[in-house]
Regions:
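Short glycine-rich substrate-engagement loop in P-loop NTPases that contacts/grips substrate
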Residues: 1-12
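Conserved P-loop NTPase "ATPase switch" module shared by AAA+ and STAND
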Residues: 10-32
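Conserved Walker B catalytic segment
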Residues: 25-50
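Short regulatory helix/loop adjacent to the ATP-binding pocket of P-loop NTPases
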Residues: 37, 57-72
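Amphipathic alpha-helical segments of the small helical/lid subdomains adjacent to P-loop NTPase cores
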Residues: 73-156
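Accessory nucleic acid-recognition modules appended to NTPase machines
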Residues: 139-353, 359
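Conserved catalytic cores of phosphodiester-cleaving nucleases, focusing on short active-site segments
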Residues: 332, 353-377, 384, 403
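Domain-level recognition of nuclease-like catalytic cores that cleave nucleotide substrates
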Residues: 404-430
Length: 430
């Protein structure tokens, strides 16, 4: 890399260069192992070197060795909602999720240009496959190929070479609780989104659409889904997966700020790991792939178009609802001052507050329910109005200074609970 830069006549005698910007520097095959020339040679000439690239792990590996303690890293993997809304002038959490947490939708749409704006009109699976593959797997694979002297992620090299790395990553991404444990990778594959949708639709009984997902060919649907997201059963893999493999994947994602641990708190006083994916597209792409697979089912194709739209919309809305909870919690934690903590709180007898914001300085707290709905209804405030649950929280975190429902509707107030528009709430975080 030194000689390539020398070829641009950047040397001690030519000091007119003060700022050097190099885009996609990680495309250089020797970047990881020769990055020190940027700090040891060129920065010593008084230059400021600004580099960028899509291989985030490559930067992390270079910072570990060649650039250790000599660089400042700014992650762009995570784009907060307020920045997305400001730059694109689109104040919609649904669009934010559908864009995949990025500033463009091209990797989340399908071949038909109209499909980008039609959640249920999928044409083929290539764009979803492309997004899932490029979001994480190709990133780590590129670094494994170019880290010639590295040992840190060598446990993943064999998985990469056998084409089985994406299987491990996507099994964890689609798991309801994103658990980094061996069982999640080794157990027979199940779609948590499909199972959740089956249960939700039963609330529509006696309507015929309530049981549609029990009548489709679930096995074939899951086989199609597995093919799209490159998931394999244990018997189909060649490399025995160990907990060490999974721990390395987790470490990698943490290094890149693609996952964040937002610990849950319990009435008993315990805390538990709660992994949140900071790039929403990693999760939403799999939900889209499930809907595409469902649309190919012969029985599903025979039901009324209105029912198709309702059911596929139900699947995606359910996923968006869970993702919205994570988005709000993550963004509040990232912007909260050191005197405040934000966390999900669970009760021993069942139920939870989606978010508690604890003001350690003022010794009080605010409690929140987070809903994807655009309509306010009494059910949304059930836990917030539960006197026993409120007493439990007040005993731990001081008086409750406010009760809130964050949703996609208009600001309003009812029965002691403030309804706030979630998009305005997120845009107001600083």
């Amino acid at each position: 890399m030194y000689y390539k830069l020398e070829g641009r006549k950047i040397d001690e005698e030519n000091t007119k260069y003060r700022y050097v910007f190099i885009d996609e520097i990680t495309l250089l095959s020797d970047f990881i192992d020769t990055a020190a020339v940027l700090s040891d040679v060129f920065s010593m000439m008084g230059m400021k070197i600004v580099v960028s690239g899509t291989d985030s792990l490559g930067f992390a590996m270079a910072n570990r060795d060649e650039l250790y303690d000599r660089s400042v890293t700014i992650h762009t993997s995570f784009i907060p909602f307020r920045e997305y809304a400001r730059l694109l002038n689109i104040c919609s959490v649904d669009s934010y999720i559908e864009y995949g947490g990025t500033l463009k939708m091209e990797n989340m749409s399908f071949d038909d240009p109209d499909a980008a704006f039609d959640e249920v009109a999928f044409r083929d699976d290539e764009s979803t496959r492309k997004y899932i593959d490029t979001a994480i797997s190709r990133n780590i694979q590129h670094t494994l190929k170019n880290d010639h002297y590295g040992e840190y992620f060598n446990q993943l090299r064999e998985l990469y070479e056998k084409g089985e790395l994406t299987n491990v990553i996507n099994r964890i991404v689609q798991h309801m609780n994103h658990r980094f444990v061996l069982r999640v990778v080794e157990d027979e594959f199940k779609s948590h989104d499909f199972g959740s949708a089956k249960e939700l639709l039963l609330h529509d009984l006696p309507a015929e659409r309530a049981t549609v997902l029990y009548d489709v060919n679930e096995k074939q649907i899951l086989e199609r889904l597995k093919a799209i997201i490159e998931v394999k059963e244990k018997s189909e893999t060649t490399v025995p997966i160990t907990q060490e493999h999974i721990d390395k994947v987790k470490k990698y994602l943490l290094m890149l700020d693609l996952i964040v641990n937002c610990p849950e708190r319990y009435e008993s006083g315990k805390q538990a790991e709660h992994i949140v994916f900071s790039q929403s597209g990693m999760r939403y792409a799999i939900a889209k792939a499930l809907v595409y697979s469902l649309m190919q089912d012969a029985y599903f194709a025979s039901i009324p178009e209105a029912d198709k739209a309702y059911i596929t919309g139900k699947i995606l809305d359910d996923v968006k609802g869970r993702m919205l909870e994570d988005i709000v919690l993550l963004e509040v934690r990232k912007t909260a001052p050191s005197t405040m903590e934000a966390f999900k709180f669970k009760f021993d007898a069942g139920g939870e507050f989606d978010m508690v914001i604890y003001d350690k300085a003022g010794q009080n707290c605010r409690i929140y329910e987070i809903k994807h709905s655009t309509e306010a209804n009494e059910k949304q405030t059930l836990h917030l109005r539960d006197a026993e649950k409120c007493q439990i929280v007040e005993k731990r975190f001081g008086p409750i200074s406010g009760k809130f429902v964050l949703y996609r509707g208009k600001d309003t107030f009812a029965e002691g609970v403030q309804y706030l528009n979630v998009e305005n709430f997120l845009c107001g975080l600083k």
